[in-house]
Amino acid sequence: MRQLCLSTALLFLLVILVDSTPLNIYHIQDEGLETSHRRGPEKRSVIDVVSGIINGVATGTKIIEKGAGILTGLAEIITKAIKGQVMISRIQFDNHTLEELPTLQLEYSTLSEENNGLKTSHRRGLEKRSVTDVVTSIINGVATGTKIIEKGAGILTGLAEIITKAIKGQVMISGIQFDNHTLEEYQTLKIEYSTLSEENKASKPALCLEPKVTGDCNATMTRYFYNTQTGLCEQFVYTGCEGNGNNFENLEDCMKTCSQEAGSL
Protein backbone atom coordinates (compact mmCIF):
# COMPACT_ATOMS: atom_id res chain seq x y z
CA MET A 1 0.00 0.00 0.00
CA ARG A 2 2.93 2.27 0.75
CA GLN A 3 4.30 1.60 -2.70
CA LEU A 4 0.92 2.44 -4.17
CA CYS A 5 0.75 5.77 -2.43
CA LEU A 6 4.32 6.62 -3.37
CA SER A 7 3.54 5.72 -6.94
CA THR A 8 0.42 7.78 -7.15
CA ALA A 9 2.14 10.69 -5.53
CA LEU A 10 4.81 10.52 -8.19
CA LEU A 11 2.09 10.59 -10.71
CA PHE A 12 1.73 14.17 -9.73
CA LEU A 13 2.93 14.78 -8.09
CA LEU A 14 -1.35 12.37 -12.16
CA VAL A 15 -0.80 10.67 -13.19
CA ILE A 16 0.30 12.00 -11.60
CA LEU A 17 1.73 9.15 -12.06
CA VAL A 18 5.57 10.46 -11.76
CA ASP A 19 8.75 8.67 -11.76
CA SER A 20 10.46 5.50 -10.80
CA THR A 21 7.64 3.94 -8.81
CA PRO A 22 5.09 2.64 -11.32
CA LEU A 23 1.55 3.54 -10.49
CA ASN A 24 0.46 1.09 -12.93
CA ILE A 25 -2.32 2.61 -15.04
CA TYR A 26 -1.82 2.50 -19.19
CA HIS A 27 -0.37 3.42 -22.39
CA ILE A 28 -1.44 3.66 -25.90
CA GLN A 29 -5.00 3.08 -26.43
CA ASP A 30 -5.54 4.46 -23.14
CA GLU A 31 -2.25 5.78 -23.10
CA GLY A 32 -1.56 7.96 -20.34
CA LEU A 33 -1.74 11.40 -19.28
CA GLU A 34 0.25 14.14 -20.77
CA THR A 35 1.52 16.50 -18.10
CA SER A 36 3.75 19.51 -18.15
CA HIS A 37 6.66 19.60 -15.74
CA ARG A 38 9.57 21.95 -15.51
CA ARG A 39 11.75 19.29 -16.99
CA GLY A 40 9.46 18.99 -20.00
CA PRO A 41 6.40 17.02 -21.11
CA GLU A 42 6.05 13.44 -19.98
CA LYS A 43 3.65 10.61 -20.59
CA ARG A 44 1.99 8.71 -17.82
CA SER A 45 -0.58 6.01 -18.40
CA VAL A 46 -3.88 6.00 -16.55
CA ILE A 47 -3.42 2.28 -16.31
CA ASP A 48 -0.47 2.81 -13.99
CA VAL A 49 -2.76 4.41 -11.42
CA VAL A 50 -5.56 1.92 -11.81
CA SER A 51 -3.20 -1.01 -11.53
CA GLY A 52 -1.73 0.30 -8.32
CA ILE A 53 -5.17 0.74 -6.80
CA ILE A 54 -6.28 -2.68 -7.98
CA ASN A 55 -3.16 -4.26 -6.51
CA GLY A 56 -3.83 -2.51 -3.21
CA VAL A 57 -7.39 -3.79 -3.11
CA ALA A 58 -6.20 -7.28 -4.02
CA THR A 59 -3.71 -7.26 -1.17
CA GLY A 60 -6.43 -6.37 1.27
CA THR A 61 -7.01 -2.84 2.48
CA LYS A 62 -9.40 -1.04 4.74
CA ILE A 63 -11.04 1.83 2.94
CA ILE A 64 -14.02 3.98 3.82
CA GLU A 65 -17.16 4.32 1.77
CA LYS A 66 -16.77 8.03 1.26
CA GLY A 67 -13.42 7.42 -0.37
CA ALA A 68 -15.09 5.18 -2.94
CA GLY A 69 -17.54 8.00 -3.63
CA ILE A 70 -14.70 10.38 -4.36
CA LEU A 71 -13.24 7.90 -6.85
CA THR A 72 -16.65 7.71 -8.51
CA GLY A 73 -16.86 11.50 -8.63
CA LEU A 74 -13.44 11.67 -10.23
CA ALA A 75 -14.42 9.14 -12.88
CA GLU A 76 -17.61 11.10 -13.61
CA ILE A 77 -15.66 14.32 -14.04
CA ILE A 78 -13.27 12.59 -16.42
CA THR A 79 -16.16 11.10 -18.37
CA LYS A 80 -17.92 14.46 -18.68
CA ALA A 81 -14.77 16.31 -19.60
CA ILE A 82 -13.69 14.06 -22.44
CA LYS A 83 -15.09 12.73 -25.67
CA GLY A 84 -12.62 10.42 -27.29
CA GLN A 85 -9.38 11.96 -26.14
CA VAL A 86 -9.26 15.54 -24.96
CA MET A 87 -6.76 17.39 -22.83
CA ILE A 88 -8.21 17.88 -19.36
CA SER A 89 -7.06 21.08 -17.74
CA ARG A 90 -8.37 24.08 -15.90
CA ILE A 91 -8.47 25.90 -19.19
CA GLN A 92 -10.17 23.22 -21.22
CA PHE A 93 -12.72 21.96 -18.76
CA ASP A 94 -16.34 22.69 -19.66
CA ASN A 95 -17.67 25.23 -17.18
CA HIS A 96 -19.83 22.75 -15.29
CA THR A 97 -16.93 20.34 -15.07
CA LEU A 98 -14.58 23.04 -13.90
CA GLU A 99 -17.03 23.87 -11.13
CA GLU A 100 -17.26 20.25 -10.07
CA LEU A 101 -13.52 19.77 -9.68
CA PRO A 102 -13.14 22.28 -6.82
CA THR A 103 -16.16 20.60 -5.20
CA LEU A 104 -14.42 17.27 -5.45
CA GLN A 105 -11.28 18.78 -3.96
CA LEU A 106 -13.35 20.24 -1.11
CA GLU A 107 -14.86 16.82 -0.42
CA TYR A 108 -11.36 15.41 -0.41
CA SER A 109 -10.20 18.04 2.09
CA THR A 110 -13.14 17.26 4.34
CA LEU A 111 -12.47 13.56 4.13
CA SER A 112 -8.82 14.20 4.87
CA GLU A 113 -9.77 15.97 8.09
CA GLU A 114 -12.22 13.24 9.10
CA ASN A 115 -9.99 10.33 8.18
CA ASN A 116 -6.99 9.78 10.39
CA GLY A 117 -5.96 6.84 8.33
CA LEU A 118 -7.02 3.34 7.56
CA LYS A 119 -5.53 0.33 9.25
CA THR A 120 -3.96 -2.15 6.90
CA SER A 121 -2.45 -5.51 7.67
CA HIS A 122 1.12 -6.09 6.52
CA ARG A 123 3.66 -8.73 7.42
CA ARG A 124 5.63 -6.13 9.25
CA GLY A 125 2.67 -5.34 11.48
CA LEU A 126 -0.31 -3.03 11.70
CA GLU A 127 0.05 0.47 10.33
CA LYS A 128 -2.06 3.45 9.38
CA ARG A 129 -2.66 4.40 5.77
CA SER A 130 -5.19 6.94 4.59
CA VAL A 131 -7.22 6.29 1.46
CA THR A 132 -6.95 10.01 0.82
CA ASP A 133 -3.24 9.61 0.08
CA VAL A 134 -4.23 7.84 -3.09
CA VAL A 135 -7.23 10.01 -3.91
CA THR A 136 -5.40 13.30 -3.52
CA SER A 137 -2.63 12.42 -5.96
CA ILE A 138 -5.22 11.50 -8.58
CA ILE A 139 -7.15 14.72 -7.99
CA ASN A 140 -3.97 16.77 -8.15
CA GLY A 141 -3.10 15.16 -11.45
CA VAL A 142 -6.47 15.98 -12.96
CA ALA A 143 -6.23 19.53 -11.69
CA THR A 144 -2.78 19.95 -13.21
CA GLY A 145 -4.06 18.88 -16.59
CA THR A 146 -3.97 15.31 -17.81
CA LYS A 147 -4.81 13.37 -20.92
CA ILE A 148 -6.85 10.28 -20.18
CA ILE A 149 -9.18 8.16 -22.26
CA GLU A 150 -12.77 7.28 -21.64
CA LYS A 151 -12.08 3.59 -21.12
CA GLY A 152 -9.69 4.45 -18.32
CA ALA A 153 -12.43 6.49 -16.62
CA GLY A 154 -14.71 3.48 -16.91
CA ILE A 155 -12.17 1.30 -15.12
CA LEU A 156 -11.98 3.85 -12.30
CA THR A 157 -15.77 3.83 -12.07
CA GLY A 158 -15.83 0.03 -11.96
CA LEU A 159 -13.25 0.02 -9.20
CA ALA A 160 -15.24 2.53 -7.16
CA GLU A 161 -18.40 0.45 -7.59
CA ILE A 162 -16.63 -2.67 -6.39
CA ILE A 163 -15.36 -0.83 -3.32
CA THR A 164 -18.82 0.58 -2.61
CA LYS A 165 -20.42 -2.86 -2.86
CA ALA A 166 -17.73 -4.58 -0.84
CA ILE A 167 -17.75 -2.28 2.17
CA LYS A 168 -20.21 -0.83 4.64
CA GLY A 169 -18.56 1.63 6.95
CA GLN A 170 -15.09 0.13 7.22
CA VAL A 171 -14.55 -3.46 6.19
CA MET A 172 -11.42 -5.34 5.23
CA ILE A 173 -11.35 -5.85 1.46
CA SER A 174 -9.63 -9.02 0.39
CA GLY A 175 -10.14 -12.00 -1.86
CA ILE A 176 -11.37 -13.95 1.15
CA GLN A 177 -13.82 -11.40 2.43
CA PHE A 178 -15.37 -10.29 -0.83
CA ASP A 179 -18.98 -11.31 -1.37
CA ASN A 180 -19.08 -13.80 -4.24
CA HIS A 181 -20.63 -11.40 -6.72
CA THR A 182 -18.15 -8.71 -5.75
CA LEU A 183 -15.24 -11.08 -6.12
CA GLU A 184 -16.48 -12.04 -9.57
CA GLU A 185 -16.74 -8.40 -10.58
CA TYR A 186 -13.27 -7.71 -9.28
CA GLN A 187 -11.86 -10.54 -11.39
CA THR A 188 -13.71 -9.12 -14.41
CA LEU A 189 -12.17 -5.73 -13.76
CA LYS A 190 -8.71 -7.28 -13.61
CA ILE A 191 -9.37 -9.06 -16.91
CA GLU A 192 -10.48 -5.79 -18.50
CA TYR A 193 -7.33 -4.17 -17.19
CA SER A 194 -5.13 -6.94 -18.60
CA THR A 195 -6.92 -6.83 -21.95
CA LEU A 196 -6.55 -3.07 -22.20
CA SER A 197 -2.88 -3.38 -21.31
CA GLU A 198 -2.34 -5.93 -24.09
CA GLU A 199 -4.30 -3.85 -26.61
CA ASN A 200 -2.22 -0.90 -25.64
CA LYS A 201 1.03 -2.75 -26.30
CA ALA A 202 -0.24 -4.12 -29.59
CA SER A 203 -1.12 -0.67 -30.87
CA LYS A 204 2.45 0.59 -30.50
CA PRO A 205 5.12 0.27 -33.19
CA ALA A 206 7.33 -2.78 -32.63
CA LEU A 207 10.42 -0.69 -31.98
CA CYS A 208 8.72 0.85 -28.93
CA LEU A 209 8.62 -2.60 -27.33
CA GLU A 210 12.34 -3.20 -27.74
CA PRO A 211 14.49 -3.03 -24.58
CA LYS A 212 16.78 -0.16 -23.71
CA VAL A 213 20.29 -0.78 -25.04
CA THR A 214 23.06 1.52 -23.83
CA GLY A 215 25.87 -0.11 -25.85
CA ASP A 216 29.48 -0.81 -24.88
CA CYS A 217 31.36 2.15 -26.35
CA ASN A 218 32.81 5.22 -24.66
CA ALA A 219 30.60 8.05 -25.90
CA THR A 220 28.08 9.77 -23.66
CA MET A 221 24.87 10.72 -25.44
CA THR A 222 21.56 11.67 -23.91
CA ARG A 223 18.84 9.62 -25.56
CA TYR A 224 15.26 8.59 -24.85
CA PHE A 225 13.52 5.23 -24.98
CA TYR A 226 9.95 4.09 -24.43
CA ASN A 227 9.64 2.09 -21.21
CA THR A 228 6.84 -0.45 -21.61
CA GLN A 229 6.72 -1.01 -17.85
CA THR A 230 6.00 2.60 -16.94
CA GLY A 231 4.38 3.79 -20.16
CA LEU A 232 6.82 6.70 -20.27
CA CYS A 233 9.49 7.96 -22.62
CA GLU A 234 12.53 8.04 -20.34
CA GLN A 235 16.03 9.41 -20.59
CA PHE A 236 19.12 7.20 -20.68
CA VAL A 237 22.80 7.45 -21.58
CA TYR A 238 23.75 5.90 -24.92
CA THR A 239 27.42 5.06 -25.45
CA GLY A 240 27.34 5.41 -29.24
CA CYS A 241 27.29 1.86 -30.59
CA GLU A 242 24.98 -1.13 -30.81
CA GLY A 243 21.51 -0.06 -29.75
CA ASN A 244 18.17 -0.60 -31.45
CA GLY A 245 15.15 1.30 -32.75
CA ASN A 246 13.98 2.28 -29.28
CA ASN A 247 16.56 5.05 -29.18
CA PHE A 248 15.45 8.64 -29.79
CA GLU A 249 17.48 11.82 -29.87
CA ASN A 250 14.80 13.85 -28.12
CA LEU A 251 11.76 13.33 -25.94
CA GLU A 252 9.34 14.70 -28.52
CA ASP A 253 10.32 12.11 -31.15
CA CYS A 254 9.95 9.31 -28.64
CA MET A 255 6.49 10.48 -27.62
CA LYS A 256 5.35 10.99 -31.21
CA THR A 257 6.50 7.53 -32.23
CA CYS A 258 5.45 5.52 -29.21
CA SER A 259 2.44 7.46 -27.99
CA GLN A 260 -1.08 6.22 -28.39
CA GLU A 261 -1.73 8.81 -31.06
CA ALA A 262 1.15 7.47 -33.13
CA GLY A 263 -0.10 3.93 -32.72
CA SER A 264 -3.52 4.93 -34.06
CA LEU A 265 -2.21 6.51 -37.27
Curated annotation (Swiss-Prot):
Reactive bond homolog (site feature) positions: N218, A219
GO CC terms on record?
extracellular space
* Key word Secreted present: yes
Q: CDD domains from the entry?
A: Kunitz_TKDP-like
PROSITE patterns listed in its UniProt record: BPTI_KUNITZ_1, BPTI_KUNITZ_2
Q: Answer whether the UniProt record assigns the keyword Glycoprotein to this protein.
A: yes
Pfam families documented for this protein: Kunitz_BPTI (PF00014)
Residues modified by carbohydrate are N95, N180, N218
> Which residue range or ranges hold the BPTI/Kunitz inhibitor domain?
208-258
Give the primary localization class: secreted
Q: In which tissues is it expressed?
A: Expressed only in the trophectoderm, which forms the outer epithelial layer of the trophoblast.
> Which residue positions does the secretion signal occupy?
1-20
Locate the region 2 X 84 AA approximate repeats. 32-200
Q: Which cysteines are joined by disulfide bonds?
A: C208-C258, C217-C241, C233-C254
Keywords, sorted A to Z: Disulfide bond, Glycoprotein, Repeat, Secreted, Signal
Entry's localization field: Secreted
The protein's GO terms of the molecular function aspect are: serine-type endopeptidase inhibitor activity
Q: Say what the protein does.
A: May play a role in mediating maternal-conceptus interactions in the immediate preimplantation period. Does not seem to have proteinase inhibitory activity.
This chain belongs to the protein called: Trophoblast Kunitz domain protein 1
The scientific name of the source species is: Ovis aries
